[in-house]
Each structure stands twice: as C-alpha cells, then as structure tokens.
C-alpha cells in the first residue's frame, strides 16, 4: 500500500515501549524508589524545603563503597531527569566505613556533566552528602 515505506518499517513482536525500555524509564521517573543494577536502591523524597535521597543496600552483595559509587551516578542522573533543584541531602550507606572524601570527589566529577552546575560542598557532620542545584 505504501511502496515508499517498504524496507523502512519493521514489525516488532513486542510493544515498542518494552523494546525501547520506555516503561522502565517512566517507572524510574515517577516512582520514589529507583533500583540499581547491583540490587541496591535509592529512595527519593521531596519536601517543600529540600529533597532527601536515601541509599539502601537492598539485595546487593556489593561492598558499601561499590553501592555508594553506583548510587552516586544514579542520583546525579535522577536529579537531571526529574529536574530536582534546591537543597538535596543524600544519606549514603556506611559512611563511617566508606571514604567520604573519595565519594565527594566523585560526586563533583559527576556534577561537571550537569548543565545546571550543581555545587557539592561535601559531607555534613552527620555524614550526609550536601548538594545545591539550581531550580529549573
């Protein structure tokens, strides 16, 4: 019926959203819990004053350090995707046993990829990572 489209269209046996992983992206944007590849997860809670992100080991067999670095990447990704701005506090796991300086340096490196140029002052006295990101 449309010879100009012959060879340019193909039949997909599955729903296009499943093939292109749109459902998983949509779920990760709308849900408060985001699962990481390691089996760990992060929980994002927005309030009027600030956003709090909690890192949980979940079913991960990885070390605290590995989970925290994986979570750092996903946190910075979620901040961009959800356009979260303002004050953000991240509660990483086992910070008394993890190198907070290395994690802070890594977060600052990841922040360089963000067009809103978030500030990463570092860790609070209670071991929470502070992030200040411009609101969109």
Where are these regions (language model features)?
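Extended, charged alpha/beta regions that create polyanion-binding interfaces
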Residues: 1-49
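Conserved glycine-centered short motifs in functionally critical loops
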Residues: 38-136
């Amino acid at each position: 019926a449309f010879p100009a489209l012959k060879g340019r269209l193909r039949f997909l046996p599955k729903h296009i959203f499943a093939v292109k992983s749109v459902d998983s992206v949509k779920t990760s944007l709308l849900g408060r819990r985001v699962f990481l590849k390691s089996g760990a997860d992060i929980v994002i809670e927005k309030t009027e004053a600030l956003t709090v992100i909690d890192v949980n080991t979940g079913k991960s067999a990885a070390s605290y350090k590995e989970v925290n670095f994986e979570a750092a990447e996903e946190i910075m990704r979620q901040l961009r995707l959800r356009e979260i701005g303002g004050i953000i506090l991240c509660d990483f796991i086992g910070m008394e046993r993890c190198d907070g300086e290395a994690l802070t340096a890594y977060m600052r490196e990841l922040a360089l990829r963000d067009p809103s140029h978030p500030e990463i002052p570092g860790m609070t006295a209670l071991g929470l990572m502070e992030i200040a990101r411009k609101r969109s």
